C-alpha cells in the first residue's frame, strides 16, 4: 500500500508520458489541417476551371449543335472548353503535367444540349466535365434566360487516412473524395 502511494506521488518521467500521449494527437491535427486545406484549395481550383470553361462555352457558336442529332454527336465547338479545363487544372497543379494530346476523351450525349466528357489516360484519375448549353433559368416567371452550365469533377486523395491509424488502428476513413464544382454564364451567341 505504501509503495503504491509512493509511485503515484513521483513526478519523474511524467513529461515524457504526456509527450507520448500528445504527440500522436498533434500529428493528427497538423496533417488534418494540411489535408483539409489542400482539399479546400483543390475545390477552389476546380471552381476556377469550371468558371473559365463556362465563359468559353457561353461564347462558342451553337451552329454545330443539333438537338435532333444522334447520341454519337460530338460538337466541335465544345473541344476548346475541354482544353481550357485541362489547361487550367494542369497549370494549377491539380492534374499532373500531362499533355492534352495523350488524353482519351469519351463523350456522352445526355440530352438535347447536354454532354458529359470523361478524360482518362493522361491523369491518374478520371476528369469528368459536364456541359449544358441549354441551361434555362427563370426568376419568378418570364422572361427566362438561356445560358451554359459547366460542371467539373475530379477526385481528391486524402493523406489523413494513414495518420488517423496512429490514434485508432483499424479506423476506416474515405481515401478519396470526388470534388465537383459548377459554374454558369449567359450564352453570348
Model feature map: region roles:
Residues 2-91:
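Alpha-helical assembly-interface signal, strongest on the long, hydrophobic N-terminal helix that forms
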Residues 11, 144-145, 178:
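A generic fold-level signal
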Residues 13-14, 32, 118-128, 153-162:
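Short linear motifs at secondary-structure transitions and domain/linker junctions
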Residues 20, 143-145, 174:
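Transmembrane beta-barrel outer-membrane domains
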Residues 44, 48, 94, 123, ...:
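Amphipathic alpha-helical interaction segments
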Residues 55-151:
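Short amphipathic secondary-structure patches
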Residues 64, 153-189:
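Low-complexity, S/T/G/P-rich flexible repeat/linker segments used as non-globular hinges
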Amino acid at each position: 500500500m505504501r509503495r503504491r502511494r509512493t509511485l503515484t506521488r513521483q513526478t519523474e518521467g511524467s513529461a515524457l508520458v504526456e509527450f507520448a500521449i500528445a504527440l500522436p494527437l498533434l500529428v493528427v491535427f497538423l496533417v488534418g489541417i494540411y489535408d483539409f486545406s489542400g482539399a479546400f484549395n483543390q475545390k477552389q481550383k476546380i471552381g476556377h476551371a469550371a468558371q473559365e470553361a463556362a465563359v468559353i462555352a457561353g461564347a462558342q457558336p451553337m451552329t454545330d449543335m443539333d438537338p435532333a442529332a444522334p447520341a454519337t454527336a460530338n460538337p466541335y465547338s465544345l473541344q476548346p472548353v475541354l482544353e481550357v479545363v485541362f489547361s487550367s487544372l494542369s497549370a494549377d497543379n491539380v492534374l499532373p503535367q500531362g499533355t492534352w494530346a495523350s488524353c482519351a476523351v469519351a463523350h456522352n450525349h445526355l440530352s438535347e444540349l447536354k454532354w458529359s466528357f470523361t478524360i482518362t489516360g493522361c491523369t491518374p484519375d478520371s476528369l469528368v466535365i459536364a456541359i449544358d448549353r441549354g441551361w434555362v433559368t427563370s426568376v419568378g416567371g418570364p422572361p427566362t434566360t438561356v445560358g451554359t452550365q459547366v460542371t467539373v469533377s475530379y477526385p481528391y486523395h486524402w493523406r489523413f487516412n494513414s495518420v488517423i491509424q496512429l490514434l485508432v488502428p483499424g479506423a476506416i476513413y474515405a481515401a478519396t473524395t470526388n470534388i465537383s464544382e459548377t459554374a454558369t454564364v449567359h450564352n453570348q451567341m
